[in-house]
Structures are given as structure tokens and as C-alpha cells.
């Protein structure tokens, strides 16, 4: 935590209110999935602490004016609805703590096509997680604009173009997901699907912000 504060001080982020972007590879916070697929990534913390580490780490990044671009992997071959629920809980906690950052949900891809995840194979829990990620992105999209405007690599026309792409792209994805939901779940709407997973909580899920780094 202190290192992040020191870096923010060097960059004068607290003084100027300037936000910088960084990557955050979350992938999953389900303890069984973390233990099996993430391996040494969680060290020096235990695999079952990963969810709390991610929550606390995201909080520290935001407190020091860092805007994370995080990744989530959906559709591991051995993933259960309980595993998805653990990461859904994290997304719900992100919303509660007003997390500022993008979360990109990625479908699992394997060397074998039959083991890869496709949109048509999403179950209700996986769809809910995908939806929650893009709901988060729609919520924070305006936070990205100052980062783009400060980027000296792009001229004004390109900045305007990128802003339009971000807004239109996020809107188009949400619209696509609404249609996909009806196709996958017999005409049901996203609200009907996600309600079940918003009210419940994974039995293995950590409470929000329990691991002090």
C-alpha cells in the first residue's frame, strides 16, 4: 500500500487529482478455481485469500488515483455456478464501494475448441457475471474520458473518436446481451436472471475488504 502512495506522490496524483490507468488480472475469486488455475499468482497470500486481496487492492488503487482495467475469465471447463457466484459477489461489492475501473469479462479459450467457452453455452450464473461486468463498465465510462483527454499521444479528433467508440460500444454490448439473454433463457430478461444471483451469496465468498495488505 505504501508503495502505491509513494508512486502517486511522485506522479503528483493526489496534488493534481490526476488518474492513471493500470492493468489488474483478477480472472476469478472462487477459492477452488484460484487454487487450481492461478497457482502462485496469489503469493505471498493463500489462494483462499485472493478475493479479499483483490477487493483491498482495488480500494488502495482507487484511493491513490489509479484506474484499473481488470480482467475476468468466464467459463472454465470445471466452473460451477457456485464458482461464478463468488465472482458475482465481488462485482456487487465493487458497486457498493463505488469502484472506479473497467472489468473486461473474457470467455475461456482452450487449445481444444470443445473445451472453449462460447456465448451460446453460458449458464445463468455465467451470464449474470458477464452482465455485472458490463454494468460496471457502463457506470464508470465517464471516468475514462479525463484519462483519454490527458493522453498526449492522440490529437483532439482521435480523442473525440475514441470517446464516441467507448460510449457507443458499451451501449451496443449491453443491447446485445439483452438479446442474448432472451435467446438463451426462453425470453427472460436480464433483470429476471440476475435477481437470483444478486440476492444470494457464495458460501465461500469473503466479506468485503477483509484482508489488510
Regions found by a protein language model. Give the residues of each.
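Flexible glycine/acidic-rich beta-alpha junction loops that bind and position SAM and/or redox cofactors
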Residues: 27-39, 74-82, 98-132, 145-162
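A structural motif corresponding to the C-terminal end of an alpha-helix
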Residues: 16-17, 56-68, 94-99, 134-161
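Radical SAM enzyme core and accessory elements
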Residues: 125-213
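C-terminal, active-site-flanking charged/polar segments
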Residues: 50-51, 89-100, 108-110
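Conserved SAM/AdoMet-binding glycine-rich loop
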Residues: 1-68, 74-76
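Catalytic cores of alpha/beta
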Residues: 3-7, 77-93
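Long amphipathic alpha-helical scaffold regions
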Residues: 95-106, 115, 201-203, 207-213
Amino acid at each position: 500500500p505504501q508503495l502505491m502512495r509513494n508512486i502517486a506522490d511522485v506522479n503528483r496524483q493526489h496534488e493534481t487529482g490526476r488518474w492513471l490507468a493500470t492493468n489488474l488480472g483478477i480472472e476469478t475469486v472462487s477459492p477452488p478455481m484460484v487454487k487450481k488455475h492461478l497457482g502462485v499468482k496469489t503469493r505471498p497470500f493463500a489462494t483462499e485469500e485472493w478475493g479479499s486481496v483483490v477487493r483491498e487492492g482495488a480500494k488502495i488503487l482507487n484511493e491513490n488515483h489509479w484506474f484499473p482495467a481488470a480482467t475476468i475469465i468466464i467459463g472454465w471447463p470445471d466452473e460451477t455456478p457456485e464458482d461464478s457466484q463468488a465472482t458475482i459477489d465481488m462485482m456487487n461489492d465493487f458497486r457498493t464501494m463505488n469502484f472506479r475501473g473497467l472489468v473486461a469479462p473474457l470467455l475461456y479459450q482452450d487449445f481444444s475448441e470443445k473445451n472453449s467457452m462460447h456465448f451460446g453455452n453460458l449458464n445463468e450464473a455465467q451470464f449474470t457475471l458477464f452482465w455485472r461486468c458490463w454494468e460496471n463498465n457502463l457506470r464508470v465510462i465517464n471516468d475514462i474520458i479525463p484519462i483519454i483527454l490527458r493522453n498526449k499521444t492522440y490529437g483532439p479528433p482521435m480523442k473525440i473518436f475514441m470517446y464516441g467508440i467507448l460510449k457507443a460500444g458499451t451501449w451496443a454490448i449491453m443491447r446485445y446481451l439483452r438479446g442474448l439473454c432472451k435467446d438463451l433463457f426462453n425470453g427472460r430478461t436480464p433483470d429476471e436472471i440476475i435477481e437470483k444471483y444478486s440476492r444470494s451469496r457464495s458460501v465461500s465468498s469473503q466479506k468485503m475488504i477483509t484482508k489488510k495488505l
